[in-house]
């Protein structure tokens, strides 16, 4: 089925045939289509970010990061549709690989076998290793951001909240609210240190999300479906128990310490009781990813060597990514001073830079 291009106001070249709407978000629409010259099936994401600075930031992050990473378990950018001029530049069109579904939909529609859980966790960790090797935190890992196709290939998507874990350059500001501001990721997959405002977030926040995703695949429902901030923390503590003194002392926020002190003591629950279908190796991986203290949490490299994913682990085929160039995230540290027009100009310049992919090469050579 071909949709009417004028109906949805998609300004893309005639080299693309639009077929169906496959997703809609706060500031974007995703349409499945075909790149006619090559016959490649694609997803075209139309983003309209210029009404809000936050959307501009996310869009610029996403384009820059998708351009940087070339990895089997990270969604790739195939093309950026170039606008006719800066004056008519009101939308961004990102062309990506078309994936048939996502893990959220799969979990809701069927019970996953342990083999599926292993393979999906392994691929998530493999993609995450590439991100972390470049000092990038995803910060919003959740089932709907893990795209899947019929072969069970998994790709991490949505880098709008991703940030560098490197320290801000000297003499720059991150808004004065502590390292890592503007955190609005889905509450259910947020690590305790995010909830309790530890001074800095580390790569460990993504491993917490992996643990939540594994438990959700095993149980068929979210592990910590908090209704609000207080309920979310309560659900986490019902499972992990009251923090030990060592864990408690890692918290840098006095307000968070006072909040925890006021709560009733709770005993730790066993993950084998919470996830009764889980194999012993899965239970062990849950224990090591879902720790209260980020310093005690397993790293992505350690998780790839865990017995739960040993059927897939191949140290020679789990590549690191190229390091980010110095200044890659510089725009983050001047965000308060930038006008909307300056954001627009930066995104325009990024879009003007061609993406060297199969699609662009095909179009140029034919």
From Swiss-Prot:
PTM remark: Dually phosphorylated on Thr-181 and Tyr-183, which activates the enzyme.
Cofactor: Mg(2+)
Occurrences of domain Protein kinase (ranges): 17-302
Gene Ontology biological-process entries: intracellular signal transduction; pheromone-dependent signal transduction involved in conjugation with cellular fusion
Residue positions of the active site: 140 (proton acceptor)
A Pfam entry, by short name: Pkinase
Entries under SUPFAM superfamilies matching the protein: Protein kinase-like (PK-like)
EC number(s) reported in the record: 2.7.11.24
The keyword Hydrolase is assigned to this record: no
Domain of life: Eukaryota
InterPro entries registered for this protein in UniProt: Kinase-like_dom_sf, MAP_kinase, MAP_kinase_CS, Prot_kinase_dom, Protein_kinase_ATP_BS, Ser/Thr_kinase_AS
GO CC terms in record: cytoplasm; nucleus
Annotated GO MF terms: ATP binding; MAP kinase activity; protein serine kinase activity; protein serine/threonine kinase activity
Keyword annotations from UniProtKB, A to Z: ATP-binding, Kinase, Nucleotide-binding, Phosphoprotein, Serine/threonine-protein kinase, Transferase
Motif TXY boundaries: 181-183
Positions bound to ATP: 22-30, 45
Modified residues (Phosphothreonine): 181
Activity modulation: Activated by tyrosine and threonine phosphorylation.
Enzyme class of the recorded protein, top EC level: transferase
UniProt-listed SMART domains: S_TKc
Catalytic activity: L-seryl-[protein] + ATP = O-phospho-L-seryl-[protein] + ADP + H(+); L-threonyl-[protein] + ATP = O-phospho-L-threonyl-[protein] + ADP + H(+)
Stated role: Responds to activation by environmental stress by phosphorylating downstream targets.
Domain notes: The TXY motif contains the threonine and tyrosine residues whose phosphorylation activates the MAP kinases.
Family assignment from sequence similarity: Belongs to the protein kinase superfamily. CMGC Ser/Thr protein kinase family. MAP kinase subfamily.
Name listed for the protein in its UniProt record: Mitogen-activated protein kinase CPK1
Organism: Cryptococcus neoformans var. neoformans serotype D (strain JEC21 / ATCC MYA-565)
Gene: CPK1
């Amino acid at each position: 089925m071909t949709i009417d291009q004028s109906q949805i106001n998609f300004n893309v070249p005639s080299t693309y045939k639009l077929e169906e709407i496959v997703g809609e978000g706060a500031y974007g629409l995703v349409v499945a289509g075909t790149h006619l010259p090559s016959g490649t099936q694609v997803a075209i994401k139309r983003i309209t970010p210029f009404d809000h600075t936050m959307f501009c930031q996310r869009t610029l992050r996403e384009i820059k990061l998708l351009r940087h990473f070339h990895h089997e378990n990270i969604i790739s950018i195939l093309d950026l549709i170039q606008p006719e001029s800066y004056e008519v530049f009101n939308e961004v069109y990102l062309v990506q690989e078309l994936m048939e579904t996502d893990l959220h939909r799969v979990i809701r529609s069927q019970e996953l076998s342990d083999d599926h859980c292993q393979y999906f966790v392994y691929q998530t960790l493999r993609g995450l290793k590439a991100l972390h090797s470049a000092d990038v935190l995803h910060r919003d890992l959740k089932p709907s951001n893990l795209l899947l196709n019929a072969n069970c290939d998994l790709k991490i998507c949505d880098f709008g909240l991703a940030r560098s874990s490197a320290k801000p350059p000297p003499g720059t500001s991150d808004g004065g609210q502590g390292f890592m501001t503007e955190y609005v990721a889905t509450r259910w997959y947020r690590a305790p240190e995010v909830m309790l405002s530890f001074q800095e977030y580390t790569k460990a926040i993504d491993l917490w999300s992996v643990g939540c995703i594994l438990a959700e695949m095993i149980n068929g429902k979210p592990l910590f479906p908090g209704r609000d901030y207080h309920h979310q923390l309560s659900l986490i503590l019902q499972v992990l128990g009251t923090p030990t003194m060592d864990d408690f002392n890692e918290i840098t926020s006095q307000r968070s310490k006072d909040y925890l002190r006021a709560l009733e003591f709770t005993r730790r629950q066993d993950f084998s009781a919470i996830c009764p279908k889980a194999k012993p190796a899965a239970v062990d991986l849950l224990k090591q990813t879902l720790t209260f203290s980020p310093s005690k949490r397993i790293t992505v490299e350690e998780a790839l060597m865990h017995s739960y994913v040993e059927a897939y682990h191949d140290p020679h085929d789990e590549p690191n990514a190229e390091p980010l160039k110095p200044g890659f995230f510089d725009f983050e540290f001047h965000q308060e001073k930038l006008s909307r027009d300056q954001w627009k100009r930066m995104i325009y310049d990024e879009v003007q830079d061609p993406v060297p992919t199969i699609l662009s090469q095909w179009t140029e050579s034919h």
